[in-house]
Amino acid sequence: MVSSLANELREGTTKSHSMAENVSFVKSFLGGVVDKKSYRKLIANLYFVYSAIEEEILLNKDHPAIKPIYFTELNRKTSLAKDLNYYYGPDWLNIIEPSSATQVYVNRIHNIGNKQPELLVAHAYTRYLGDLSGGQVLKKIARGAMNLSDERGTKFYDFDEIEDDKIFKNNYRSALDTIPLSDEQVQNVVAEANISFTLNMKMFEELNSSIVKIITMIIVSTVRKFTLKSILATAD
C-alpha cells in the first residue's frame, strides 16, 4: 500500500480537475449564467448518478476498500429528490430520465460495483469531496442566478449531518489512506478517478447547447434594447 492514497488522487487528477472547470457549462455556471431548465436537467442527471453510486456503495459497504469510507451522511439522493420535487412537481420521478452521457456514467458505476468494487472509491472521491469543497459557492451562484427566494431548489448542496466541512474532508482523506490497496490497485483507482472526471465532463457538455441558447437570447435582447434606445434618441 502506498503512503497516501489521498495524495495520489489529488495529484493524479489535477489535470482532469482543471479540464472539468473549463467545460463551457461549468464556466457559464461559475459566471452566474444559470437557467432553471438547464439546472433542473443537471439535477435530474445527478440523481441517477448518485442513486447508482449510493446503491453500489451500500451493496459493497463491507468490502475492505469501501468500509473505511462508508459515510451515509454524504448521501445525496434524498436531497436531490427534494430539489426535483421543487423543479418538476410531485410526479418528478415519472418525468425525468438520464441523458445519454449520464446513462453511460451510471452503467459504469454498476459495472465496477459488480466486478471491481475498490474502484467505487474513485467515484465517491470525485463527487463527494467536490460537492463538499465547492458546494456552498455553487449554491450561492445558483440561488442568485435563478432568483430563488427561499431554501428550496438547492438542497443538493446542504450536508445537514456534517457539522464542519473542513474537518470532515480531513477525516475522509485520512480514511482513504487506511484502505488496503496494492500499488497497482492505487493506480487503478487514480485512473478511474480520471475516468469519473471525463464522465462528468461529457454529462456537462450535453447541457452546453442550452447555455449557448441562453447567452444568445441575452445578447439579442441587449442588442434590441440598445437599438430601441438609439431609435428613440434619434427621434428626439
Curated annotation (Swiss-Prot):
Domain of life: Eukaryota
GO CC annotations on file: chloroplast
Binding residues for heme b: 17
InterPro entries, alphabetized: Haem_Oase (IPR002051), Haem_Oase-like (IPR016053), Haem_Oase-like_multi-hlx (IPR016084), Haem_oxygenase_CS (IPR018207)
Gene3D superfamilies: Heme oxygenase-like
GO molecular function, one term: heme oxygenase (decyclizing) activity
Annotated localization: Plastid, Chloroplast
Annotated EC: 1.14.14.18
Reactions catalysed, as given in the entry: heme b + 3 reduced [NADPH--hemoprotein reductase] + 3 O2 = biliverdin IXalpha + CO + Fe(2+) + 3 oxidized [NADPH--hemoprotein reductase] + 3 H2O + H(+)
A single GO BP: heme catabolic process
Keyword Iron: yes
EC class (word): oxidoreductase
Keywords: Chloroplast, Heme, Iron, Metal-binding, Oxidoreductase, Photosynthesis, Plastid
Physiological role: Catalyzes the opening of the heme ring with the release of iron. Key enzyme in the synthesis of the chromophoric part of the photosynthetic antennae.
Family to which this protein belongs: Belongs to the heme oxygenase family.
Protein name according to UniProt: Heme oxygenase
Gene name for this UniProt entry: pbsA
